[in-house]
């Protein structure tokens, strides 16, 4: 995913428009004195609107149905009824727990274990390598300036620069075979 862990953990179902495919980042999860609560995001630029692909929307719909069944079984014991990602008692999942769940999913799928932040980095790298504008990438990641994006992912931009040079070289100086 391309969200910070706290943003992902703080998602409520009213932050996701399943019919239009839009996800709104409006909160982050903070933990104080052992209690989790939603707070405003890291910066004003962190609040954002992200369009989700259809396959993610399908997975979210399935998750929502499964979660509704679990909430029904739990009765009144479900702690946060609107949270998207919860533990077995319906309380917020914290980042470390999400990473444990992600590791289990990867193991079941026969994939190497990864962390949530790796998904954020991969998302940014794929966008960069697809020549998406730095401003669009910065907006999706919640960076207030493109400088943050460029500084953080400069190595990926450098790789793209080499590919761009090779493409120009092929187009201008090499004959198609």
Label the predicted regions:
Residues 15-22, 113, 132-154:
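Short, polar N-cap/turn motifs at the start of nucleic acid-interacting alpha helices
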Residues 6, 11-14, 96, 122, ...:
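Structural detector for helix-capping/boundary residues
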